[in-house]
Amino acid sequence: MNKKILQILEYDKVKEQFMNALTTAQGQKELSDLVPLTDKDKIQLLFDEVADFRLLTQENGLLNLGKTNDLTEILRRLELEASLSGKEFVEIKKVIQLGINIQRFFDEAENVETPSLNITLEKLVDLSGLIKKLEIFDNAGSLYDNASLELMHIRASIKSHQSEIRKIMQEMLTKNLSSLSENVITIRNDRQVLPVKAENKNKIAGVVHDMSASGQTLYIEPNAVVSLNNKLNQKRIEERQEITRIYRELAEELKPYSFDIRQNAWLIGHIDFVRAKYLYLTANKASLPALTNDKDIILFAARHPLIDAKMVVANDIKFDKTLNTIVITGPNTGGKTITLKTVGLLTILAQSGLPILAEDGSRIHLFDDIFADIGDEQSIEQSLSTFSSHMTNIVQILAQADENSLVLFDELGAGTDPKEGAALAIAILENLRKRNVKTMASTHYPELKAYGVETQQVINASMEFNIDKMQPTYHLQLGVPGRSNALEISRRLGLPETIISEAGQQISESEHDVNQMIEKLEEKTREVIESSRNIKKIERENQSLHKDLTKVYNQINRERDFELEKAQKEAQEVVKKASLEAQEILKNLNDKAALKPHEIIAARKELEGLAPTIDFSKNKVLKKAKAQRGLKQGAEVNVTSYGQRGKLIRLEKDGRWTVQMGSITTRLSEEEFEVIETPEQIQAKTKNVSKKVTSKVKAQLDLRGMRYEEAELELDNYIDQALLANLIQITIVHGIGTGVIREMVQKKLQKHRHIKSYEYAPINAGGSGATIAILK
């Protein structure tokens, strides 16, 4: 895309609005290098990343990123084996740690899938092994004492020498206060000295390191600490040498990973940029438009991003594929230029993968290039008039624009004789229309109103003007040509009625009729716009309610799953405890050679007491299951409490069954035995299930005519049924239409773990209107 349009539409100023949300140097670099794209798949991926991040944040909170600086020069020097400073090692550490934190955040994220972001995350290299090597630095870039054993010993010696020197110096300071100019110990040439009055220099034996500017004070190192200071300086030299050695070894260990560190830095920067887009999206009530190749520009509540949010006026702009040209007529200062810039700028932002200031449902066609003649671009150096300057620009546009270009003209034909200017404007627009070039033009020439009415694929538009307040509203009115309000405005400003009346007589009857017709059109348009706004308001409220309900539903599901898991664990603990106690009781029984009847009854009661007393009488699921057990007289059962087979004799009044086990007859509750199914029952049940599943599942599902949510639910159910029926291949008919249902189907198939592969149907079987899937 040509650079001139980026300057005209102030593209870089909009990019600056994202800069404050970025925390990494790499993210800022990616923003600076950003230009509009024309590859639909690449742009869609950028939008999908933001959509993924939005879902991730809604479920798991905002990802926090620390500030990082540019590693380009640091890594270049690392690869050249040049020495690095402690602060530079810390910068490397920050990037590595940030990569680890990001990976951990995504790994621990719940209730959301981020397939688009995963493409970036999968490229992140795990460098956690290097973090331990870099933990020897504090945040300022200084080495900790335990960076090496040698460094620890050296610094311990330094502290010992410093302490000893400080003690001696403090004693000398106290003893020689009268000889000192100040009651302090100071530093000269890295050695501790005393500020001695010049006349008392012979009272303190030592080495003079400095003199005050006045010559009244000498800075003397007492002989008592000279030797210790020498030792201290030697240890400091050893400390520097050890630090250099540690730096060198660490650099050698990091060098093989320089490529991975550099790649991680850029990947982190990209995630930072995605995060910045999300923050812009939410802070500005922006949206991610649908991308099209059908020449649709549909913008709902479009706003110019460089106008104050409190002042900007939102406009619906429907420049669909049925239209080739929009002609905005009417007086100046009504917002025509801003409308042109808004369309161009939002298109460029969308093609850059950035959110746009428009409501959901907006659609943007991808253009190869955008051209504009907006504002007074005359060149003083070339001594061109305003008209010549514009015409020079227009000539270049006509030479370069094609059917996949968007052209914007502001005050087309201005700067010359009105009749000739209008004629030129019509001819230029007609040339572009015949070449199928999408064009928006503003003009104040009334002749272009007739062109907009009489010409196919061309529509008039105007900017609304509030007569009562005598000021423009900046609302775009599609289908309504602009009209002059000069007479009415003059009347309200106090111009004598006689003058207004005489002026009105100068206007032809046909022109007067046209103005009345336009006025009625404006009223109807206002009514339609107001009705449309109310409908959109209700839609937004419904969408908000749907989001809230979905969030509550997901929360309930999470809490339910948590409670089920908790109950399951508790049940397992109860069973485990009961099992251990039962084993202990059985062991005690086995230890006794002979048992008396009352001991057997007591032991059995003890076993029964291990089971928790839960009332299942109101449980519908258990009732249904019990009814399906088919308990009847003569049925074979397995008595679980005795581990023996038996036969049901009769059902007693208390709900228990009399069961015969060999020669023993006893009464048991239904929970104490299980019905043993005969081979015939098992075979009949299997046939039943097989017949029930396979008889109802077809190999084709037709989603045409369904709403998105309805189609999505129908597809989920159908795949489950197809899997139960052991189908190998299925066909989903979704039609071509807008492509929304088709994209939903393919995303579902891509994510489903039981789908082996999928592709569009052959041409003779529906082509891109149907998808064939192979089941695993």
Swiss-Prot record:
GO biological process: mismatch repair; negative regulation of DNA recombination; rescue of stalled ribosome
SUPFAM superfamilies: DNA repair protein MutS, domain III (SSF48334), P-loop containing nucleoside triphosphate hydrolases (SSF52540), SMR domain-like (SSF160443)
Gene3D superfamilies per UniProt: 3.30.1370.110, P-loop containing nucleotide triphosphate hydrolases
Assigned keywords, A-Z: ATP-binding, DNA-binding, Endonuclease, Hydrolase, Nuclease, Nucleotide-binding, RNA-binding, rRNA-binding
Residues annotated as domain Smr: 701-776
Superkingdom to which the source organism belongs: Bacteria
MF GO annotations: ATP binding; ATP hydrolysis activity; ATP-dependent DNA damage sensor activity; endonuclease activity; mismatched DNA binding; ribosomal large subunit binding; rRNA binding
E.C. number: 3.1.-.-, 3.6.4.-
Binding-site residues for ATP, renumbered to this chain: G330, P331, N332, T333, G334, G335, K336, T337
Keyword Cytoplasm among UniProt keywords: no
Family membership: Belongs to the DNA mismatch repair MutS family. MutS2 subfamily.
Assembly, per entry: Homodimer. Binds to stalled ribosomes, contacting rRNA.
Cited function: Endonuclease that is involved in the suppression of homologous recombination and thus may have a key role in the control of bacterial genetic diversity. Acts as a ribosome collision sensor, splitting the ribosome into its 2 subunits. Detects stalled/collided 70S ribosomes which it binds and splits by an ATP-hydrolysis driven conformational change. Acts upstream of the ribosome quality control system (RQC), a ribosome-associated complex that mediates the extraction of incompletely synthesized nascent chains from stalled ribosomes and their subsequent degradation. Probably generates substrates for RQC.
Protein's name in the database: Endonuclease MutS2
Organism listed in the record: Lactococcus lactis subsp. cremoris (strain MG1363)
Gene name as annotated: mutS2
